[in-house]
Amino acid sequence: MSLNPEPRFRRKTLITAMMCATLPGLAAAQGSEPKALEALDVTASRGQVASEATESYISGASTTSMKMELSHREVPQAVTVITREQMDDFAQNDINDVLEGTTGVTVESVETDRTYYTSRGFDINNFQYDGVGMPAVYDNVQGELDTAFFDRVEVVRGANGLMTGSGSPAATVNFIRKRPTADTNASVAVTGGSWDKKRIVGDVSGAVSESGAVRGRVVAGYEDKGSYLDRYNNEKQMFYGVLEADLTDTTLLTLGHAIQTSDTDSPLWGALPLFYSDGSATDFARSTSTASDWSYWDNTQHNSFVELRQELAGGWRATGTVFRLENESESELFYQYGTPDRQTGEGLKAYPSQYDLDVEQWVVDAYATGPFQLADRTHELVLGASWSRSETVDEARYGRGIGNPLPPLTEWDG
């Protein structure tokens, strides 16, 4: 073992020298006067954030209630937001699936292709796209609106006449469309299910120009499915295209169009008889259907919009939208009525019919929103106006075979 103390002595000397070297700096720091820095104010708008970018079940802001980007705590109404992540995780591929899982909303499918939505005891007929829309002509929805085009769905329960023009004590359903992204993204989702269900959806988004000032997005899909009901089949085709262009640093122009076709073979029209002629309850197989093999119900929806957004001074923003929605429906349906005999099953009669429906809606919406100072406080203000027009052509025809006797449902093959 070495008894030489030289290494320890050198370490002590080095540490002492380092401490002495830092003392003048410490003394200078303690002796200097505190310096006040100039105040720096940082302001920024929350901006629109797509729910698909968050991969969350929670949306940061909602615009359905006030056209202002408010957090859920700031909205003075009951609001539920169904995000893209939730729709994907639970395979909520149509609006029926979405609203069935929404608090305070009841979905009633009276037949295979006709649905009623209710909230707080009233029918829901206020539907919007990006906050623009008008009340539906009928309280029921024909066909199934697919959710492949939407980033999220916002549901405001209770009256919302301030933003819709016609208040309803039920609810307002706002479909927030997907928008183009600056980065290139692409996805394909393939789904299979019971009764030969097949579904595929492709989604491509990204910059169109080298500078990124023009961006585009295309969503296309196809679905085909059967049912536990005899002879029933539904086929859907969807397409959505949207373009965004930065006209200036503060001006954004958006153009978009969507089309969806939903073609159903052998849809139900009416329901199975509940009672036999002797008053006892019927008991049919789960797959029993009164539909004929020639009946059909085809629905087509066209959805087009042009939107111009201008950022103004002082945190203000102005938005103008022209929106067109057209729903076309063609159907040949077969209804059976009467009370069958319990022993023979006979007693039902035919009621064939044909329907053509065409609904065209136009909406022009313009508003501005921003902050202002009053009484030493900052307030938010929305100013705007909306114009809308709806035209409906509804035709119904009834067949010659009304009242003709039919075979028992246990033998009915369409």
PLM regions and their residue ranges:
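Transmembrane beta-barrel strands of outer-membrane/channel proteins
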Residues: 188-192, 218-224, 255-259, 320-324, ...
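Residue-level detector of the transmembrane beta-barrel scaffold of outer-membrane proteins
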Residues: 118, 128, 185-189, 215-217, ...
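N-terminal Sec signal peptide and the immediately downstream disordered periplasmic leader
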Residues: 1-90, 96-104
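Short acidic/polar hinge/loop motifs at secondary-structure boundaries
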Residues: 107, 116, 132-157, 175-177
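Non-catalytic regulatory/gating segments with a bias toward low-complexity or hydrophobic composition
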Residues: 79, 87, 98-99, 153-158, ...
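Outer-membrane beta-barrel channels and translocator barrels
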Residues: 209-211, 246-250, 313-315, 369, ...
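Acidic/polar loop-and-plug regions of large Gram-negative outer-membrane beta-barrel proteins
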Residues: 223-227, 240-311, 324-359, 402-414
